[in-house]
Amino acid sequence: MSDYLSVSTLTKYLKLKFDKDPYLERVYLTGQVSNFRRRPNHQYFSLKDDKSVIQATMWSGQFKKLGFELEEGMKVNVVGRVQLYEPSGSYSIIVEKAEPDGIGALAIQFEQLKKKLSQSGYFDDRHKQLIPQFVRKIGVVTSPSGAVIRDIITTVSRRFPGVEILLFPTKVQGEGAAQEIAQTIALANEKKDLDLLIVGRGGGSIEDLWAFNEECVVEAIFESRLPVISSVGHETDTTLADFVADRRAATPTAAAELATPVTKIDILSWITERENRMYQSSLRLIRTKEERLQKSKQSVIFRQPERLYDGFLQKLDNLNQQLTYSMRDKLQTVRQKQGLLHQKLQGIDLKQRIHIYQERVVQSRRLLSSTMTSQYDSKLARFEKAQDALISLDSSRIVARGYAIIEKNHTLVSTTNGINEGDHLQVKMQDGLLEVEVKDVRQENI
């Protein structure tokens, strides 16, 4: 008679087979994502085709490394290992890597990241910085061996020889290139004497240019203190670095031209033009002054200068005569007023006037004293009355007469309304405070 196996024994045996099978250690699988709902850490979903379904698990560390957003219904290529879960006896694939299926995988990744960054405001015009009109020092983040730096040096030297160019060498493609580009941009921003940055590389495939589509590079350009001009690939190539940069140039030469908007020839032409304008303006001013001088020489004032002050002499004589008449009239008026005052003073008995005013002063003093006494007595009576009223309201005097003050939650209680059994009250008495609990409430008239 054959021995019967337990379910757990069989499951352990199958798990051992799964774990030891080299073909299940690394499985390359294509399937459609199903039952996907993003979770905070590890991700659990299914992969299916038209005939079968397999459960899939992706740990948080691997999921964070994905360069695209996993979506329901997306067809993906995954790499992982197959394992058996003993408690349920089901098998699943532990996904280590994943990418969209088909030749458009990078395009999908590009569009997803572009949408994400756009919604976060990375590409908004309000964040764009202006390119300075005049620069003294330009930083260039690119490969030291490519044609980019040579084209930029040649163009800048031709357009404005005095501008200094500082190269920040970096990898522009391959593993780790994106992180190195981002770090180099941050390093360039530490240079206080730089006016702007040119970030770029020459042409290549989408894979070659992909470092400039990485989120870390976009963030480094966005956070840059310095204005950034991007020059990645050829005119038909567009990367996310181009969207976030303050200006985008199709070629390194175009980037150098954007970095030096005003050339040495422009400045010399401007100076020459200003010199000519100043010269012509000076000539016109001199001619105008000469014409005015000739007209002045021909005027009557210069031919007969004595006529210049004839009118002033006549006006001075008139003013002198008016002053004499005015002083004489005022003196006569003063003398008349003095005579009238003298006559009035002679008709006044000064002693009697003084006696009358003295009597008035005495009466005013008596009236003032009487009024002040009356007002004082009245105010004193009102004060004493108010003082008595205040004293009667003093809580300490109230409790001294045998009364008590009752409060509930620091609020004065004057009626049984709102008081319930079990309430805690504070009773203030002459010599202390009682904390009491209400046992019964009865309403009675006193």
From Swiss-Prot:
Its main location: cytoplasm. Its EC number is 3.1.11.6. HAMAP family: Exonuc_7_L. It is found in: Cytoplasm. One of its GO terms (molecular function) is nucleic acid binding. Heterooligomer composed of large and small subunits. This is Exodeoxyribonuclease 7 large subunit. GO terms for biological process: DNA catabolic process. NCBIfam families: xseA. Bidirectionally degrades single-stranded DNA into large acid-insoluble oligonucleotides, which are then degraded further into small acid-soluble oligonucleotides. It catalyses: Exonucleolytic cleavage in either 5'- to 3'- or 3'- to 5'-direction to yield nucleoside 5'-phosphates. It comes from the Bacteria. It comes from Streptococcus agalactiae serotype III (strain NEM316). It holds the Pfam family tRNA_anti_2. Belongs to the XseA family. PANTHER family: EXODEOXYRIBONUCLEASE 7 LARGE SUBUNIT. Keywords: Cytoplasm, Exonuclease, Hydrolase, Nuclease. GO terms for cellular component: cytoplasm; exodeoxyribonuclease VII complex.
